[in-house]
Structure formats: C-alpha cells, structure tokens
Amino acid sequence: MSNWLSDSIMAKKGEANGKENSSHSITEDSQGKYHYVLGAYAEPVLTVDPGALISVETHDAFEGKIEKETDKPSEILNVPYLNPQNGPIFINGARKGDTLAVYIKSMKPRGEQPVGTTCLISEFGGLVGTKDTAMLNDPLPEIVKKVVVDEKGVHWSKNLILPYQPFIGTIGTSPEIEAITSLQPDYYGGNMDVPDVAVGNVIYLPVNKDGAYLYLGDCHAAQGDGELCGVAIEHPTVTEIQVDLIRNWKIENPRVESEKFFMSIGSGRPMEDAVRRAYRDLIFWMEKDWGYDKLEAYFLLTQCGKVRLGNMVDPKYSMGASIDKETLLKGLNN
C-alpha cells in the first residue's frame, strides 16, 4: 500500500481497510465478449470479495479495429459499438447505498506497436458540427494517426515525445435498472474521460445494484483537457485495480481521491450544468464528512476550487471540481 493510501477514505472506511487479500485476472481470452453498455443484465465475468487485486487486459476504444493510418473510421467502425468494456465484476456483499472504492494501482500498454491510436472522425469532435449540433459545414477529413506508446512516453513525432500519463477513460457501476451505452457518462461513472482517474488515485462509485457490477475500459495514454477532437491516445492496456467496499456511505456522483486533493465529478449538458453538479456534490461532501457549514464551503470553493474538464464531446460533458486536501483541513480550524 502506498504511503498516502493508508490514510485514504478507502483505507479508513473500506471493509478490507484498503488492503489486498486476493489476486485475480481478466485476460482478453477470459473476458471473451466485451460490452458496450453498463447494466446488470450481463453475466459477471468475475466475482470477488472486497480487497481483491484484479489485473485487467483492456482493449482500445475501437476494439483494435483501426490497424493502420490508411483506415477510414467511417468504413470500419459501427456506432454505437465503441468503447468496449471489461466486466462486469461482481463484488460480494455490495448493496444499493454502498460505495465501491477502486484504487488504480498500475497501467501498462500492451500489444504490438504502434498501439496508440487517435483520429478525426466525421461529425465528431469539440469544434465541428455533429448530429446534435448540426451545421452546414462540410465534415473534416478522416485522418488516423498511429503512435508508439511505451512507458517512456507517447512517441508523437521524431522530435516530440509526450509524457505517458495513462488513465481510465470509462469506468462505472451498473445503473439500477437501465443498461446505458458505454459512450455516455452520468451518476454511475461511465465515459467521463477525466484524466485524474489515473494511476495512484482512488475513484469512488455509487452502488446502485446488488453486486455493483463494475465495468472498465477505454484507457488513454495521453489526453488534453476536453479531449478536443474526440479521440485521445487510445491504447490497450494491462490495468491493475484494487477494489474495496464502503458500507452505508451513499454518494450520488463519482468522486476521486488523490494524495493531494478531493474531487467530485459531474456530467451533463450544457457544460455549466456539469460544473454545477460537480461543485454542489463537493459542497455536500465537505458538509457531511468534514462538518463544514454549507455556505462556508460555498465561500471557500469560490476562492480556491479548481475545475477539470474531462470531455466536451460525449452525449454528456464531464467536469471535475476539486479542493486541495491541505486547504480543506486547514479551513476546519477557523
């Protein structure tokens, strides 16, 4: 366990106290069929107890179908069959009203190089007309860029290597009754594309259904805020996660804890509503768990709160509102 993790909410409130008690793996072969919706109607591929360490072989967002730079996404991809998800993982003892804690222990690229893919897709992206934001402009040309991704970095060009900063673009629990496309984010998690859902951090997800039914996939090697053209550096990975279960800690939005900050994630359209949802949840969190007066938290976040833009291209946009741990704790002493 990392030094900070032993002092995390996961370690303090989790059934397994943030400690590993078993090891499991989901390989591409054992996964078999990948999923394109998050719901409780698929047979769990794995059943574990809180404290389980799980190694997962994720696919890229295109399930490996874009193989070369001459490929045309419009001819190869079948929307909405994008964003393949591993899982579901059934967590023993998880009940509605609990919270699932997922510590992201490690992520590594896998497969034959070049494993990284980004592209321009017709009528998709933050600065183009889409089916939802219809324009008269002609679509941009379809362009595919394949890049080598290793632990040294993302080899963008001969002279430029971007840092390898992997994170899980899509992770979530099953909604209570719906089965929702893996392309959409919401209260259960989903396709948030928030870069802070990264190695070394914990994401907290609401349990809406017995067993939680955890899904994950769509791992990114690098991404700027907003995922502007709609496609980050998509790559297949071996991702190692550790799960724990927090009883009777009911949350309504995904939350992230790092060594330095606490974050609430809100999803919605327009973008300002996603920000409102994130900040409101953070204020309620500060009030309930740390004893802040609600209006004092509102005042404080006005001065020092930070906002992280996850994606601005999905059916709903995702925003993360955060406060530094040091600031939050010092504010309690006034």
Question: Model-flagged regions — what are they?
Answer:
Residues V48, I91-A94, V197:
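Short, well-ordered loop/turn sites that connect or cap secondary structure elements
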Residues Y164-E272, R277:
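Conserved mixed alpha/beta catalytic, RNA-binding, or beta-rich assembly cores of soluble enzyme
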Residues A61-K72, M107-C119, G211-A221, G310-M312:
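Short, Lys/Arg- and Gly-enriched loop/turn segments at beta-strand edges
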Residues G18-L77:
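N-terminal, Lys/Arg-enriched amphipathic/low-complexity engagement segments
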